[in-house]
Protein backbone atom coordinates (compact mmCIF):
# COMPACT_ATOMS: atom_id res chain seq x y z
CA UNK A 1 0.00 0.00 0.00
CA UNK A 2 1.29 3.45 -0.91
CA UNK A 3 2.25 5.92 1.81
CA UNK A 4 -0.17 8.82 2.38
CA UNK A 5 0.61 11.95 0.41
CA UNK A 6 1.35 15.12 2.38
CA UNK A 7 -0.57 18.33 1.75
CA UNK A 8 2.50 20.05 0.31
CA UNK A 9 3.15 17.24 -2.17
CA UNK A 10 -0.52 17.21 -3.12
CA UNK A 11 -0.41 20.97 -3.79
CA UNK A 12 2.75 20.50 -5.85
CA UNK A 13 1.15 17.75 -7.91
CA UNK A 14 -2.01 19.78 -8.42
CA UNK A 15 0.02 22.77 -9.59
CA UNK A 16 1.95 20.51 -11.97
CA UNK A 17 -1.32 19.34 -13.47
CA UNK A 18 -2.41 22.97 -13.84
CA UNK A 19 0.96 23.79 -15.39
CA UNK A 20 0.58 21.13 -18.03
CA UNK A 21 -2.95 22.37 -18.75
CA UNK A 22 -1.65 25.93 -19.17
CA UNK A 23 1.17 24.80 -21.44
CA UNK A 24 -1.06 22.61 -23.58
CA UNK A 25 -3.79 25.22 -24.06
CA UNK A 26 -1.55 28.29 -24.11
CA UNK A 27 -3.78 29.98 -21.55
CA UNK A 28 -2.49 32.57 -19.09
CA UNK A 29 -4.40 32.35 -15.85
CA UNK A 30 -4.70 35.60 -13.90
CA UNK A 31 -4.92 33.90 -10.52
CA UNK A 32 -1.57 32.22 -11.15
CA UNK A 33 0.02 35.66 -10.87
CA UNK A 34 -1.45 36.46 -7.44
CA UNK A 35 1.09 37.12 -4.66
CA UNK A 36 0.25 34.02 -2.61
CA UNK A 37 2.30 30.92 -1.74
CA UNK A 38 0.14 28.69 -3.92
CA UNK A 39 0.54 31.07 -6.87
CA UNK A 40 4.31 31.16 -6.42
CA UNK A 41 4.29 27.37 -6.42
CA UNK A 42 2.31 27.41 -9.66
CA UNK A 43 4.77 29.86 -11.24
CA UNK A 44 7.70 27.70 -10.15
CA UNK A 45 6.18 24.59 -11.67
CA UNK A 46 5.43 26.49 -14.87
CA UNK A 47 9.13 27.30 -15.13
CA UNK A 48 9.97 23.66 -14.47
CA UNK A 49 7.58 22.56 -17.21
CA UNK A 50 9.19 24.96 -19.69
CA UNK A 51 12.83 24.15 -19.04
CA UNK A 52 12.59 20.57 -17.73
CA UNK A 53 9.62 18.90 -19.44
CA UNK A 54 10.87 15.42 -18.53
CA UNK A 55 10.21 16.15 -14.84
CA UNK A 56 6.59 16.90 -15.65
CA UNK A 57 6.33 13.77 -17.75
CA UNK A 58 7.59 11.68 -14.83
CA UNK A 59 5.17 13.38 -12.45
CA UNK A 60 2.19 12.90 -14.75
CA UNK A 61 3.18 9.27 -15.24
CA UNK A 62 3.17 8.74 -11.47
CA UNK A 63 -0.38 10.17 -11.42
CA UNK A 64 -1.45 7.60 -13.98
CA UNK A 65 0.15 4.70 -12.13
CA UNK A 66 -1.58 5.62 -8.89
CA UNK A 67 -4.92 5.89 -10.65
CA UNK A 68 -4.42 2.66 -12.55
CA UNK A 69 -1.44 0.42 -11.68
CA UNK A 70 -1.84 -1.41 -14.98
CA UNK A 71 -1.44 1.81 -16.99
CA UNK A 72 1.56 1.91 -19.28
CA UNK A 73 3.57 4.91 -20.37
CA UNK A 74 2.21 6.42 -23.56
CA UNK A 75 5.02 7.74 -25.82
CA UNK A 76 2.59 10.13 -27.52
CA UNK A 77 1.93 11.74 -24.13
CA UNK A 78 5.65 12.32 -23.65
CA UNK A 79 6.02 13.74 -27.15
CA UNK A 80 3.05 16.07 -26.79
CA UNK A 81 4.33 17.37 -23.44
CA UNK A 82 7.79 18.03 -24.84
CA UNK A 83 6.36 19.80 -27.89
CA UNK A 84 4.04 21.91 -25.71
CA UNK A 85 6.91 22.89 -23.41
CA UNK A 86 9.20 23.73 -26.35
CA UNK A 87 6.45 25.72 -28.04
CA UNK A 88 5.80 27.60 -24.81
CA UNK A 89 9.52 28.40 -24.45
CA UNK A 90 9.83 29.63 -28.03
CA UNK A 91 6.64 31.66 -27.66
CA UNK A 92 7.78 33.32 -24.44
CA UNK A 93 11.36 34.18 -25.37
CA UNK A 94 10.75 37.20 -27.64
CA UNK A 95 7.72 38.52 -25.76
CA UNK A 96 7.31 40.61 -22.59
CA UNK A 97 5.40 37.66 -21.13
CA UNK A 98 8.76 36.21 -20.06
CA UNK A 99 8.88 39.01 -17.51
CA UNK A 100 5.85 37.47 -15.86
CA UNK A 101 8.10 34.80 -14.44
CA UNK A 102 10.91 37.17 -13.42
CA UNK A 103 9.45 40.47 -12.22
CA UNK A 104 7.07 41.16 -9.32
CA UNK A 105 3.33 40.90 -9.76
CA UNK A 106 2.94 44.71 -9.67
CA UNK A 107 4.86 45.01 -12.95
CA UNK A 108 2.62 42.60 -14.87
CA UNK A 109 0.95 43.98 -17.98
CA UNK A 110 -2.83 43.78 -18.15
CA UNK A 111 -4.15 41.24 -20.63
From Swiss-Prot:
**Which protein are we looking at?**
Putative protein p34
- Designated gene of the protein: 34
Amino acid sequence: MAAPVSGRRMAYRASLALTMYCCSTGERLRFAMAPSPSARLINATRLVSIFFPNLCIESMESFRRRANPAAFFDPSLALSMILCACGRLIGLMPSPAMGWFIFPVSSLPSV
